[in-house]
UniProtKB/Swiss-Prot annotation:
CDD domains: H2MP_MemB-H2up (cd06062)
Gene giving rise to this polypeptide: hyaD
Binding site for Ni(2+): E19, D65, H96
Family under the similarity heading: Belongs to the peptidase A31 family.
Keyword Metal-binding: yes
NCBIfam families named among the record's database cross-references: hupD, hydrog_prot, PRK10264.1
Enzyme class: hydrolase
Name of the molecule in the record: Hydrogenase 1 maturation protease
GO molecular function, one term: enzyme activator activity
Species for this entry: Escherichia coli (strain K12)
Length: 195
């Protein structure tokens, strides 16, 4: 592959507490910066094998995800190159990680694994709040994860320009601000009805 094509992929389920961390980081990268046309920011969500095309077309792949490495909750790590197989053997928290491991393995078998792969991962603090957003620990790590992703991309020679306007990677109703706002209003209404 002679042309550079960079895929920055946020993985996880937005509706399952810290499981959505990777997608939230991808949203920030999309919202805050303008990228060269050969860089694509992707909400990979929990799409599994549907992500194979993105992976196989990339020369550089940056994965953003919540990963259970058994570390202190809220710990942020960046792994690159030969350290990526550790991602494949980490404790799986959800089906998307099993299927994304399969995506990477299949791309490798087919001879289309990106030449450069890195991962920015967070040890989750909370996963038992289905329908909930990020825990406070995970939310506090969003700026650091954004900076870690930017540092990895800069190591690959990719430096974006700051965006002057706000942009949404997903549907506006799924943005963290809107999702949290609706959830908080619903919670308060429920509390008022009960009390």
């Amino acid at each position: 592959m002679s042309e550079q094509r960079v895929v920055v992929m946020g993985l996880g389920n937005l509706l399952w507490a810290d499981e959505g961390f990777g997608v939230r980081v991808a949203e920030r990268l999309y919202a805050h910066y303008h990228w060269p046309e050969y860089v694509e920011i992707v909400d990979g969500g929990t799409q599994g094998l549907n992500l194979l095309g993105y992976v196989e077309s990339a020369s550089h792949l940056l994965i953003l995800d919540a990963i259970d490495y058994g570390l202190e909750p809220g710990t942020l790590r960046t792994y690159a190159g030969e350290r990526i197989p550790a991602y494949l053997s980490a404790k799986k928290m959800s089906l998307h990680q099993n299927s994304f491991s399969e995506v990477l393995a299949l791309a490798d078998i087919r001879g289309h694994l990106p030449a450069h792969i890195a991962l920015v991962g967070l040890q989750p603090a909370m996963l038992d709040d289905y329908g909930g957003s990020l825990s406070e620990l995970a939310r506090e790590q969003l700026p650091a994860a954004e900076q870690a992703a930017l540092a990895q991309l800069a190591a690959w020679g990719i430096v974006p320009q700051p965006a002057n306007e706000s942009r949404c990677l997903n549907y506006d109703c799924l943005s963290m601000e809107n999702y949290e706002g609706v959830r908080l209003r619903q919670y308060r209404m429920t509390q008022e009805e009960q009390g």
